[in-house]
Amino acid sequence: MNNLFSVNVKYLKPKEGTDGFKKVNETYLVNAVSFTDAEAKTVAEMELRSIYEFQVDSIKREKYSYVLTNDKDGGMWFNALVESNAQEEGETPKKIRMSLCIESSHIDKVSEIISDLIGNSLPYELIKVSVSNIFYVIQ
């Protein structure tokens, strides 16, 4: 199982065309072993992006069942909640809820991505889709 952490980072970014700076808050989803590892991976990512003056504002554990990246059609991150009824022979049906983090260019394409993932293997219902504040995923 993935240990996913949401890491909020604050830094100053130069404004285009002026000498001023603007405050930027970004949220990174980090696959890490611990809070310390999540912070270390975030610091390494910020250094790769040549951002040296920043502050890790908060770190919290996230409970996503799956994180689906989309290299060809990405851009924004969405939270999706999917409910399914799983039933084995002779047993009562069990409701399973999955929280997904999905990268897509538009909210309308999220349902396509979910149907590609689940397909016809389980009957499911898409409960909710919302825009996430995640800026980037660090593996």
What would you call each of these model-derived segments?
Residues 4, 8, 20, 41, ...:
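A cross-family "folded-core" feature that marks the main globular domain of proteins
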Residues 13-30, 48, 91-100, 118:
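A cross-kingdom feature marking solvent-exposed beta-strand/loop segments within repeated
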Residues 53-90:
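Intrinsic, low-complexity N-terminal interaction/targeting segments
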Residues 27, 52-65, 122-137:
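Short amphipathic alpha-helical linker/capping segments at the junctions of internal repeats
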Residues 11-15, 31-34, 82-88, 102-106:
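Beta-strand elements of well-folded, non-transmembrane domains
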Residues 3-9, 26-29, 38, 42, ...:
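Short, structured motif recognition centered on aromatic/hydrophobic residues
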Residues 34-50, 106-121:
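A short, charged, amphipathic alpha-helix used as a generic interaction element across diverse proteins
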Residues 92-94, 98-138:
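Mixed-charge, glycine-accented linear interaction segment located at domain edges/termini
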